[in-house]
Amino acid sequence: MTVPALASASGLLQVASLLGLLLLLLKAAQLYLRRQWLLKALQQFPSPPSHWLYGHSREFQEESELQPLLKRVEKYPSACARWLWGTRAMVLVYDPDYMKVVLARSEPKAPVLYRLLIPWIGCGLLLLNGQTWFQRRRMLTPAFHYDILKPYVGLMAKSVQVMLDKWEQLVAQDPRLEIVGPVSLMTLDTIMKCAFSHQGSAQTDGDSHSYIQAIWDLKNLFSIRTKSAFLQNDIIYRLSPEGRKNHRAARIAHQHTDRVIQLRKAQLQKQGEMENVRKKRHLDFLDILLLARMEKGNSLSDTDLRAEVDTFMFEGHDTTASGISWILYALASHPEHQQRCREEIQGLLGDGTSITWDHLDQMPYTTMCIKEALRLYPPVPGVSRELSKPITFPDGRSLPAGIILSLSVYSLHHNPQVWPNPEEFDPSRFAPGSARHSHAFMPFSGGSRNCIGKQFAMNEMKVAVALTLLRFELAPDPSRKPTVIPEVVLHSKNGIHLKLRKLP
């Protein structure tokens, strides 16, 4: 290479280096200004000292995340700041008055967090905002009309009985049983039959096991990514081991939901089937989506349809499985309340061969115990919002637009200022006529964006608890105490292990 050519190449390299340095300095300045803005915005909300780079991440290690969280609840009234890392912070909220103010507004889901779910569940009802969310919610609400929910009780009972029959065989060999796995298969079986018109059994289908495992992987990977500044960039994440694992798990989940959609489409294309569906007064969840796609194609794309199915396939089974598993654990840990529930159910159902819609409102003490377990172990431990405009709370403190609020349902339910002796299992808190703040108990979130399927979930929990208590006596396995982990859904790191005894 000639001397002039070398000089030219050297000059280009210097220019590129200077541009790279300039971009690096601009990014550093941007991050510095972002941190200064956050420090000023959060000055009314104290917190433990945080590191300028990794924030409070060392405080919230996976094994002990709940303990520092509950210490904050006791030390800092109503809310406090939490730094994920140097340039990302949020305000943890665990006061019912604060919750009420936030949920009365139509604030969007925090995009910096919820966008990480898009490769998995797409932009369905959970992630949509604004007018699009309102239209989709209005379209899907009829799928949870009580006329639709009534016959679901029989389907729920059949799925529960399949699970209990399996348990009976297993405990004949070993009374110790991990329940989260089989409960998840049972709730998946239920949602597929009720909301997706599925004719098979997810509890005997091998593909369902791979779907359940994929969901567990996706939840864990989401939690890991939300806590890592390095993994926020999409390109870096896709190239990382976690990103590749996330892609594989999402593909398995999508294959499962695609099969469900295609199977129902094929059923609707049979002669006369579409006309029969149109004549129904109330349609189930998937039929609403498919008819909207077939008859009003522009209003719902194939991508939209799959996103809703992915969302409800996950939410419709996993949160309910968490709730049922923790309820059974709570009753196993408190045999006196378990026996009182059993006696109530025996008086109502007798031999337990059938349970109907009308029975569900006739088990008040069991319902009290279910609600108290949901207080202690809320299936969705928190939701996040991003302020679209400034907000002022009842105590006079305020926050500007752009701040992320983490509405910590778990912390709210364990707040001693809201619930005296919060770690005690006390079903009388939910006795008829007992008074409490309207936003003190939020297992299904609150406001206009509360869980659309909350009645479905409560019905399924009642059916599962009632039929289980009629057939088994439950006790905790003292050698395997659950380790509670608050991810997308509250779960135990080491499963939930019980000892079961078949009742005569």
From Swiss-Prot:
One of its GO terms (molecular function) is heme binding. It is found in: Endoplasmic reticulum membrane. Gene3D superfamilies: Cytochrome P450 (1.10.630.10). It comes from the Eukaryota. It catalyses: an omega-methyl-long-chain fatty acid + reduced [NADPH--hemoprotein reductase] + O2 = an omega-hydroxy-long-chain fatty acid + oxidized [NADPH--hemoprotein reductase] + H2O + H(+). InterPro entries: Cyt_P450, Cyt_P450_CS, Cyt_P450_E_grp-I, Cyt_P450_sf, Cytochrome_P450_Monoox. Its main location: endoplasmic reticulum. The keyword rRNA-binding does not apply. Its EC number is 1.14.14.80. Its cofactor is heme. Catalyzes the omega- and (omega-1)-hydroxylation of various fatty acids such as laurate and palmitate. Has no activity toward taurochenodeoxycholic acid. This is Cytochrome P450 4A25. It comes from Sus scrofa.
